[in-house]
Amino acid sequence: MTQEGKRILVMAGGTGGHVFPALAVAKYLAQQGWQVRWLGTADRMEARLVPQYGFDIDFIDIKGVRGNGLVRKLAAPFKVIRSILQAKAVIAEFKPDVVLGMGGFASGPGGVAARLAGIPLVLHEQNAIPGMTNKLLSRIATQVLCAFKNTFTTVKSKVVGNPIRRELIALGAEPKPLADDALKVLVVGGSLGAKIFNDLMPSVVAALSKQQSITVWHQVGKDNLAGVKAAYQQQGQEGGVNIAEFIDDMEAAYRWADVVLCRAGALTVSELAAVGLPSILVPYPHAVDDHQTRNGQVLVEAGAAFLLPQAILDVDKLVGKLQLLANDRTELARMGQRARDVAVLDATEQVAAVCISLAEKG
């Protein structure tokens, strides 16, 4: 059956961990002839990013309520009702065949509005521990999808992995020669950087370079460039370090790297698996329900990563792990292969297939 003219409303926003997997599915369905519309909030990253990919976006007024003050909590029910009505209006005008929720503030009201309208609702949870919105919506969803095993314990769900860019999947399939020169360390702390990496890495490189040849590509985050550059200079290490506020071409960065030091966001973990890179994971300690630790366990249990809680992280521990990897390049390569072995490479197609199936039934 042709997919020409089928319509999907995609709900995802707030962070790249929600938006980029949703974009992968949206692009795939658009190539199959689907009309794609997006539901988000005007003050989050989807407002800027989604139109760049050629998709129309509608906005509703909704913010998170978890952990907010009393007045905001009292007003929350009225704001939620208003946002559901706004989402219902979008659905009534667009008439989607299926609605896909992938996290973010807009998913809650949009998901409720979809079910009230009798439209199939598909949820996808990227993290190993479900967010509050998906946890609530899972009770009314037509189909619940997740990236990791045992994410949902109260509803039936299907494990499909996290949708990621095709370029990264292709990169992981390329043969990677055994590293025998300077250890190439990619340091990524997200778009805002990670203060702990910015604080420790200049001293780590200084200590390690006395024993090993090492080069570093360090994403320091917005407004941190001058300070981190000065710290490397004070350690006499600026020569072997490439410092950037933000790395636009992650495909090039992954291709360059031997090992990655990073947080354990769901999308990061899935990308590391897809490209087949070993990693040192430092979960963000303030993540809701400590979900990053659970995300990272997938790679740790596979023997593809080390996990160091930020509370115990120091220069000596980082030097020790990097020294270990630098001294055993065969094990470094094995860790990369183990990462690739646990990758789910067809997540985009699996999510899209569920949406297509439900649209055809409707």
Curated annotation (Swiss-Prot):
GO biological process: carbohydrate metabolic process; cell division; cell wall organization; lipid glycosylation; peptidoglycan biosynthetic process; regulation of cell shape
Entry's localization field: Cell inner membrane
Any one annotated GO CC term: plasma membrane
Binding annotation for UDP-N-acetyl-alpha-D-glucosamine: 15-17, 127, 165, 191, 247, 266-271, 292
EC number: 2.4.1.227
Pfam families noted in UniProt: Glyco_tran_28_C, Glyco_transf_28
Entry GO MF terms: UDP-N-acetyl-D-glucosamine:N-acetylmuramoyl-L-alanyl-D-glutamyl-meso-2,6-diaminopimelyl-D-alanyl-D-alanine-diphosphoundecaprenol 4-beta-N-acetylglucosaminlytransferase activity; undecaprenyldiphospho-muramoylpentapeptide beta-N-acetylglucosaminyltransferase activity
Catalytic activity: di-trans,octa-cis-undecaprenyl diphospho-N-acetyl-alpha-D-muramoyl-L-alanyl-D-glutamyl-meso-2,6-diaminopimeloyl-D-alanyl-D-alanine + UDP-N-acetyl-alpha-D-glucosamine = di-trans,octa-cis-undecaprenyl diphospho-[N-acetyl-alpha-D-glucosaminyl-(1->4)]-N-acetyl-alpha-D-muramoyl-L-alanyl-D-glutamyl-meso-2,6-diaminopimeloyl-D-alanyl-D-alanine + UDP + H(+)
Domain of life from the UniProt record: Bacteria
Pathway: Cell wall biogenesis; peptidoglycan biosynthesis
Family in the record: Belongs to the glycosyltransferase 28 family. MurG subfamily.
Role played: Cell wall formation. Catalyzes the transfer of a GlcNAc subunit on undecaprenyl-pyrophosphoryl-MurNAc-pentapeptide (lipid intermediate I) to form undecaprenyl-pyrophosphoryl-MurNAc-(pentapeptide)GlcNAc (lipid intermediate II).
Protein name: UDP-N-acetylglucosamine--N-acetylmuramyl-(pentapeptide) pyrophosphoryl-undecaprenol N-acetylglucosamine transferase
Name of the gene: murG
